[in-house]
């Protein structure tokens, strides 16, 4: 419940219902609806409305891979480091101004070489603001390093390669506004579980945790 005030000083106590056709609807304590044109709202109330209603947004991700620069003296044979940089863009679709803050999240997934399990290699978050300068397009970058190497005298290839991404945008209350992924196996009902993972954890296609993969070398040693 809020006390609204128009530019003429008229005060109305009520709960915000919606914005429609250039006005807002407020529900009074007795249940009646009252309409107030946006241009008649006080500056404080207009700012409140512009932070209350999250806009329609879309999110897109462009992932680029590059070989990590390393000191040649410390490079082992068959030891590859790849940096994946994800450029995330959040674009406001709705025309109504929005002065609040959204949160964007991006998760970079790898696929383990030995078992095929998935692992969270990197993640990043950013506070999303739409301004006159960015014209409703907010971008940020997140990077993660993937390592693939041979172990035990080249008997086994270990590490993880880049598999894909998940991007999510939420409103100030934590409600999801939009999500985007290039992982065909990642179902909507499993996304929240993945968002709770920490970097380095292993999991399967249903986003259930798995134990750290152990080298097959130990099984092979028993046969000798």
List the predicted regions and their residue ranges.
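Compositionally biased alpha-helical segments
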Residues: 1-129, 153-164, 189-198, 202-209, ...
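Short, solvent-exposed, Trp/other aromatic-anchored flexible loops in extracytoplasmic proteins
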Residues: 121-190
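Short, solvent-exposed mixed-charge patches
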Residues: 221-224
């Amino acid at each position: 419940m809020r006390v609204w005030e128009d530019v003429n000083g008229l005060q109305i106590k009520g709960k915000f219902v919606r914005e429609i056709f250039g006005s807002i609807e407020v529900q009074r304590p007795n249940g009646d609806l009252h309409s107030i044109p946006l241009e008649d709202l006080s500056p404080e109330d207009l700012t409140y409305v512009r932070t209350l209603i999250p806009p329609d947004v879309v999110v897109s991700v462009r992932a680029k891979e590059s070989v990590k620069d390393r000191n040649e003296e410390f490079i082992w044979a068959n030891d590859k480091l790849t940096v994946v940089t994800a450029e995330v863009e959040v674009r406001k679709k709705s025309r109504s101004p929005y002065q609040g803050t959204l949160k964007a999240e991006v998760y970079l997934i790898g696929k383990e070489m030995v078992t095929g399990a998935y692992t969270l290699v990197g993640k990043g978050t950013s506070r999303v603001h739409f301004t006159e300068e960015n014209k409703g397009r907010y971008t940020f970058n997140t990077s993660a390093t993937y390592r693939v190497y041979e172990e035990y005298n080249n008997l086994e290839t270990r590490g993880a390669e880049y598999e894909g991404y998940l991007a999510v945008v939420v409103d100030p209350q934590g409600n999801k506004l939009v999500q985007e992924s290039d992982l065909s196996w990642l179902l909507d009902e499993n996304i929240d579980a993945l968002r709770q993972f920490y970097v380095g954890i292993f999991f399967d296609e249903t986003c259930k945790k798995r134990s750290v993969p152990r080298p097959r070398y130990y099984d092979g040693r028993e046969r000798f």
